Amino acid sequence: MNSHVNPGTAADAIPGVSPDPIHPARYPRRVLLAVAGLSPQILTETLYALAQSGSEAFIPNEIYLITTVEGANRARLMLLSEKPGWFHRLRREYALPEIDFPPENIRLIHDAGGTPLDDIRSASDNDAAADSITNLVRELTAATDSALHVSLAGGRKTMGFYLGYAMSLYGRPQDRLSHVLVSSPFESDPQFFYPSRESRVLTTRDGRPVDARDARITLAQIPFVRLRDGLPKHLLTGTQSFTATVNAAQRGMAAPRLVLHSQALRVIAADIEVPMRPAEMAFYLWLAERRQAGLPSVNGVDAKADEILVIYKRLVGPLDGGFERATAALESEGMTKAYFEERKSRINRVLTDTLGPSACQSYLIHSEGARPKTRFGLLGLLPAQIDITAQRAESAKRSPVKSTHRP
């Protein structure tokens, strides 16, 4: 006979103690997310397996299900109705605590026009499923006080793939991914929802009686690569598409390429346009020209202000207000440490925010050497990876992705 589940205190947040990612069950907000096709049983099977997983069981206090119109209808009728209400029966039978799972937490996959999908039949339906799943995972991983457990057990294979990939993109150290393995002959029986504590006889498709009490469910944890820390900030919020998010993660692994359009005042790094003010672009272009020409990195105090002013003037013209202010400051005081550090910090900040912590590394202004002889430059780039052109950006061979970030 299956043992009575006692959640105990392991699944409760400990007052005054910050949650430890090693112990997801101790987070105050614990969320279970699953995808489902026409078999909502995967949710009760997963919840049962989680509750049986030891002294520090991850008992969710919220559940979300993502599915199609028909899948949602089946989930409401079979899980949340008064009868049979298998979700509520599982909670009562195993004395599980309150779990927030209203009908509103059954999220539908919508097409590009906002119409809920009955099924996933076409390439555009696949794209819609990918975006819906990615956006929900992004939403559920936004709160720092939450831990997310995701089940890949249900839905079409593509839905499981997208859910696993979304976890790679947005999963945090405290988040987990799993699959449930149900013993034969229960794994495909539409009457089976979880192993019962008392005897409950089912009839298999071939007419054979079996007892649900004898079923065994194994929770298999699935390790996954976490790429979240390498994503740009703007992809951690909003509703960016699955494809856009994957491309951003991929750019962090590609060979670097920096394009500077001096006449159009555009900086394009890793095929993304990076918004820079003229003062910062002049400073960055100065370092890029030095790197491209094979000149050594520079010491901030020894940097020649007139070289930067020549580039600044070339970018905006002699009558620009910003150029006039920079000229007045640099001609009277020269290149001060404060001016150098401010330009460097602003440039590195906008590069990090736009490209993400991983993809930006090749394009940052890096330092080398110990103080007071520390020198700075675009040390992550080879000269051949820098393209400086005075032509208008329309002549560029590739169209960059326009960033939504603003400095």
Residue ranges and their predicted role:
Residues 152:
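Conserved SAM-binding loop
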